[in-house]
Amino acid sequence: MSSHVISLTVNGQAIERKVDSRTLLADFLRDELRLTGTHVGCEHGVCGACTIQFDGEPARSCLMLAVQAEGHSIRTVEALAVDGCLGALQQAFHEKHGLQCGFCTPGLLMTLDYALTADLHIDFSSDKEIRELISGNLCRCTGYQNIINAIKSVSPTTEIAKSEELV
């Protein structure tokens, strides 16, 4: 079994660690760095629970080896909190009851955080477009409507639509 020293950035912090060449990125984040917000569900990249941001884009950490992250930037759900307080998207999930058991929540948050900050031309006032956006993240509990309500409450599209209704 071979091991490698990898250097990467995780949540803005430079990290250098020795890892086994077969260690999955999800396991490295959870076991080595103790960032347990990233969940592992299906271990096949289907459920989306392990979604992180890899160089700014959503990626399934259960499908990547830790050594593949060498020289790259990783952002996990822990980075969404601001000074120990919930970030806006996390707060919206809390207020709109966008979670029940919470297992899928980190992956959904990382997907949605990316979508809100990237220029994807998504109409966040459209349930259909939001459902399409989160179709790669499976949730057994909520039925998705409260997740949709949460994303609508923080999206710029919704804020623009609300202000146009007032005019």
From Swiss-Prot:
Cross-referenced Pfam families: Fer2, Fer2_2
Give an example GO molecular function: 2 iron, 2 sulfur cluster binding
Q: How does activity depend on temperature?
A: The caffeine dehydrogenase activity increases linearly from 25 to at least 66 degrees Celsius. An incubation of 30 minutes at 70 degrees Celsius drastically reduces the enzyme activity to 11% of the initial value, and 77% of the activity remains after 30 minutes of incubation at 42 degrees Celsius.
Q: Does the keyword Iron apply?
A: yes
Where the record annotates domain 2Fe-2S ferredoxin-type, the positions are 4-80
**Alphabetical UniProt keywords:** 2Fe-2S, Iron, Iron-sulfur, Metal-binding, Oxidoreductase
Q: Which CDD domains does the UniProt entry name for this protein?
A: fer2
Q: Which residues form a coiled coil?
A: none
EC assignment: 1.17.5.2
Query: What is catalysed by this protein?
Result: caffeine + a ubiquinone + H2O = 1,3,7-trimethylurate + a ubiquinol; ubiquinone-0 + caffeine + H2O = ubiquinol-0 + 1,3,7-trimethylurate; theobromine + a ubiquinone + H2O = 3,7-dimethylurate + a ubiquinol
Q: Could you tell me how activity relates to pH for this protein?
A: Optimum pH is 7.0.
Give me the residues that bind [2Fe-2S] cluster, please: 42, 47, 50, 62
Q: How does it assemble?
A: Heterotrimer composed of an alpha (CdhA), a beta (CdhB) and a gamma (CdhC) subunit.
Q: What exactly does this protein do?
A: Coenzyme Q0 (ubiquinone-0) is the preferred electron acceptor and, to a lesser extent, coenzyme Q2 (ubiquinone-2) can also be used, but oxygen and NAD(P)(+) cannot. Is involved in a caffeine degradation pathway that allows Pseudomonas sp. strain CBB1 to grow on caffeine as the sole carbon and nitrogen source.
Record PANTHER family = OXIDOREDUCTASE WITH IRON-SULFUR SUBUNIT (PTHR44379:SF5)
Protein name (Swiss-Prot/TrEMBL): Caffeine dehydrogenase subunit gamma
What is the gene called? cdhC
